[in-house]
């Protein structure tokens, strides 16, 4: 038998009558993720997704790394299947974990029996396998309290499986089970993290980016597309709709009070994002807004910003401080790209003294001089669609 991958399910197992649809979606997501790594058989049994190579050309290491980023999976391990026979299990453990046993100074064996018809109890199996391994690798001591290596034996309905420590999975729910949302993606640290957090709840994302040439460069746009590519392994395939925003910002600067520049700009972003959401049948908007980080993120300012839409505005970063956001940005691999020093449309025409506690009626009055619908129509008509795949 050949090495394979075991993906342990998380919240999916709690879904009751809907569980099968969640498992089907998760298997489809895993299949999509490992497709470029070779020809694999994907199937689900006993709260586990099995990823089994069909031939020797499969890149199981690449598939393993891909599985770790699939939402819905809490743990991933490479394992060697074998017959449900004690001597076969011992032989498999000696062969499969030989390098780990030689490198470790201590070990223990943990056994689990999903198949209760197996002749030995979990403790008895651990004792027999542990004794045989210690005899084969005498420099590796048995330590059941603080081992350097844990050898796992799983007795399941179809086979026994031998593996070392599992690695952490992405958690969450399978992409596609939580509906569709439109995420406002800028070039900063926050919006990629907020997109990741919403995708983790099973939401498929459509991205919108606002681009303001010549005030923002092509390099700034490419930076955002690079961020989207970094999100794809987590969030799945997506389309980034690049919306030209220059005319809107120039009209705001010409016709509106400076203290409201940022607020009115963000109200336009929300209006356009809702238009996009209506087109792609999304049920929510997602932003990287926090509470109190900048002048436009006070409670009063957030209220003014979302006044122009009727969809829910999801702000997953609202309770996090900057250090937590940066830490998560590093984890998902977007931080180094996010801090590249390129312009962003949010920094264009920044007011010197922004209003931190704006009055909604004053803001509505300030933007009344603008041809709101005409500006939005022209921006929507000139969008660029960039499709990003694995």
Regions found by a protein language model. Name each.
Residues 1-182, 192-238, 307, 355-360, ...:
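RNA-binding accessory domains that recognize and position tRNA/RNA substrates
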Residues 128-133, 166, 171-178, 245, ...:
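Active-site adenylate/phosphate-handling loop in enzymes that bind or generate adenylated species
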Residues 183, 207-209, 242, 287, ...:
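Structural beta-sheet core signal
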Residues 228-255, 344:
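A conserved beta-strand->alpha-helix junction
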Residues 293, 341-349:
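Small/polar glycine-rich anion-binding or flexible loop at a beta-alpha turn
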Residues 333-341:
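A short alpha-helix-loop-beta-strand transition element characteristic
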């Amino acid at each position: 038998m050949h090495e394979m991958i075991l993906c342990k399910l998380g919240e999916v197992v709690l879904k009751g009558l809907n569980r099968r649809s969640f498992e089907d979606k998760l298997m489809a997501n895993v299949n999509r993720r490992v497709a470029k790594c070779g020809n694999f058989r994907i199937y689900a049994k006993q709260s586990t997704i099995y990823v089994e190579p069909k031939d020797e050309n499969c890149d199981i290491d690449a598939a393993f790394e891909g599985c770790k980023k699939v939402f819905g999976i809490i743990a991933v391990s490479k394992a060697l299947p074998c017959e449900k026979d004690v001597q076969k299990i011992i032989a498999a453990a000696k062969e499969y974990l030989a390098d780990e046993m030689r490198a470790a100074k201590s070990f223990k064996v943990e056994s689990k029996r999903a198949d209760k018809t197996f002749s030995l109890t979990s403790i008895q199996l651990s004792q027999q396998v542990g004794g045989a391994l210690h005899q084969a690798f005498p420099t590796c001591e048995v330590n059941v309290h603080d081992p350097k290596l844990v050898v796992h034996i799983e007795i399941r309905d179809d086979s026994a499986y031998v593996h070392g420590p599992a690695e952490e999975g992405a958690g969450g729910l399978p992409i596609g089970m939580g509906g569709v949302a439109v995420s406002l993606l800028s070039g900063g640290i926050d919006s990629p993290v907020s997109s990741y957090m919403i995708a983790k709840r099973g939401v498929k994302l459509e991205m919108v980016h606002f681009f303001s040439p010549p005030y923002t460069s092509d390099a700034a746009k490419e930076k955002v597309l690079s961020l989207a590519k970094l999100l794809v392994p987590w969030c799945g395939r997506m389309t980034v709709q690049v919306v030209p925003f220059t005319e809107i910002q120039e009209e705001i600067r010409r016709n509106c009070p400076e203290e409201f520049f940022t607020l009115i700009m963000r109200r336009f972003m929300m209006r356009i994002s809702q238009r996009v959401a209506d087109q792609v049948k999304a049920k929510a908007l997602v932003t990287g807004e926090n509470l109190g980080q900048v002048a436009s993120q006070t409670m009063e300012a957030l209220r003014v910003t979302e006044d122009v839409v009727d969809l829910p505005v999801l702000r997953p970063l609202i309770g996090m401080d900057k250090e937590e956001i940066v830490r998560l940005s590093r984890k998902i691999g977007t931080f180094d790209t996010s801090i590249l020093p390129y312009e962003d449309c949010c920094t264009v025409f920044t007011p010197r003294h922004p209003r931190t506690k704006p009055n909604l009626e004053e803001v509505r009055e300030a933007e009344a001089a603008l041809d709101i619908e005409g500006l939005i129509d022209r921006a929507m008509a000139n969008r660029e669609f960039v499709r990003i795949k694995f």
